[in-house]
Amino acid sequence: MKFEELAKAFALKELPESEVEITGDVPADMINEYKDAALTHIAGELDLPGFRVGHVPTDVALKKVGELTVLEEAVELFVKDFYPELVELKKIEAVGRPDIRITKLAPGQAVSLVIVAAVYPVVTLPKNWKEIEKGIALEEAQPATDEEVKQTIDSLLKSRAVPPTLTEDEVKEGKKAEAILPELTDEFAKSLGAFESVDKLKEQIKKGIGEEKQRTAKDARRAKIIEALVAETVVAVPAVFVESELDKIMSQMQEDVTRFGMSFDDYLKQSSKTEEGVRNDFREQAAKRAKLQLTLNKIASDEKIEADKEDVDAEMKHAIEHFPEANMALLRIHIETVLRNEKTLQILEGNKDPKHVASNHEGHAH
């Protein structure tokens, strides 16, 4: 390791909220090794009269910005190389970008650095986490009623109604006509798909409503199990995890708004809110989601739960068809996380050996 001795000299201090502070001094000669690259980088971005951008000579750039600015850039380049070795040597499981402060900077002198980094937090699960589901019963889903079946059929009839027709004179006279509903016959049932008769159609509708009620009951039980688990799990959630969840929420929200034919800026104007205001509205929800994900990660790690490769491959194939421009490596990680979450949640629900789970293609298993 190039910086092993220097890294050993840096002091490590644990901070609240899953952060650490690393402090130390960097010899001037180490920083000086980066000054030429720093000056070249600065010169390449300067926009000065008489020169094309990217073609400013380094001596002209130095006179323009001054030695201290070059030194600051050199420190930044040095830290990019030094930081990965530092966290590896200190055995820090850092997440996100560190906050780097220069507390002493002068030509020819050692540079003093203070680095604050978020670290992957310690997650303490409740001792009885495997037993939580036993205290939360699955509420019995009621079968579909005749009225619910009738409402569904009425909706089907209305969706296939024949639009009313009026002559121009009738329109001028203010006449109104109602859409003509088709009759509920075996022929109508057959037109909807593989239904031989009205009775078969009603039978399938009744079955579908019943299955939906069962899914709703299962979802409600899962939500209660999650709520109980997260409430008893102890973890200091780093801000970077909350911000990451907020980014996901905002991205989904922007997609939803766009789908309805409105720009996000117009949505903000109509809502009399700023983007930061909307983020703050969802901050509590994002914190809960972040805590849940950390909790699921801990269980998956302890129990050695992994997504099955064939399930991941199948989901990748589906996702690529819909998002061909996506980063394939990141997409695979995302799918693996979603499927691992689903397996973990099924185990939480009492399923000892979940097989071949599938995502809902919406990106969140929770």
Question: Model features per residue range: what roles?
Answer:
Residues 1-366:
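FKBP-type peptidyl-prolyl cis-trans isomerases
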